[in-house]
Amino acid sequence: MSGLKPLATALVLAAMALPAHAQQPAPPKEPVRDEFFWLGEMNKASTVINAEQGLLDRALAPKLAQGIARVIEAGNQPGARRPSTVITFEPLMIKEAGVEVTLIHAGRSSQDMHATYRAAIMRDRLLTLAERLNQATRTMVELAAAHRDTVVPNYTNGVAAQPNSYGHYLLGLAAGLDRDAQRIRETYARVDRSPMGTTVLNGTSWPLDRQRMADYLGFAGLVENAYDASQIAAADLPVEVGGIVTGIALHVGGFIEDVMTQYAQARPWILLREGGGTTGGGNTYVSSAMPQKRNP
C-alpha cells in the first residue's frame, strides 16, 4: 500500500476491517417479469440473433445492445416508467442507441411481440399457480394422514347428513385439486410455445431463426401457424387458464362453505386457530362485544 495516498489507504484498511457479511454485496433483486421485461429480452435477443444471421451489421450490434441495456437499466429503477408496448418502448431505444436500432425490427411486428410476452407472462403465472396449488394439496394430504380416524359430519344441501372420516373427506378434496394440477400441466404445454417470428397474419419472408429465439426466451416449442399465433391462441388460451382458476375456486369454495356451515353450529367440529401472522393468519377473531363468540 506504499503507493496509495493517505485517504485511499485509510479507506482500504477500513474495508478490510469490516465484518465478512458487510463486505458482501446484497444479492440482486429478481427483475419484475412484466411486459417491459419481456420487450427488453426480445430486443436483446433480436440484436444478437439477427447479427449472427447476417440480418444486422455485426459492427453495429454492440452499440445497439448498449443502448438497449441503458433503457432496461433505467426502467428497472424504483418508480421508473416501464413501457408495455412496442411503440412506446421503441422511442426510448432510439434515444439511447440512435435511429439505427430500428433495424432490429426486421421481420417483427407488435402483433407477434405482444403475443409472445402475453404467453411468457401467462406461463410464469401458471407456474406460480401450480406451486401454490401443490402446497395446498400437500397440506390436505398431510392433514388427511393425521385425521384418518377423526369422525366428522358431511353435509348435503347445507345439512349434516352422514358421519365420515375427516381424512377421507380431505382426500376427496385433494383428488379434485389434483385434477386441477393436471389441467395446469396440459395447458402449460400449449402456452409454452413461442409466437415470436410469426410477424402478423401471413408471417414473413425474412429468414429469422425462430428456434433460436424460442430457446433464448425459454419456450419449449414454436407456434407453427402465424395467424393462430396472434389472432386465435391469444384469445382462447387466456380463457382456458381462466377455466382452470374457476375450477380451483369451486373446490376451495366448497371447502370454505363446509367450514362456514359447521362453524355456525353450537359445537363446531373445526375451530380455526386465533391470531395473526404465522399463528393463525387472521382466520378467526373474538367478537368485540361478545367475548365467548368467535367470528371466522
Model-derived regions: residue spans:
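Gram-negative bacterial Sec-dependent N-terminal signal peptides
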Residues: 4-19
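Conserved helix-loop functional segments at active or binding sites
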Residues: 146, 183-186, 190, 219-222, ...
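Glycine-rich anion/phosphate-binding loop at the beta-strand->alpha-helix junction
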Residues: 180, 230-296
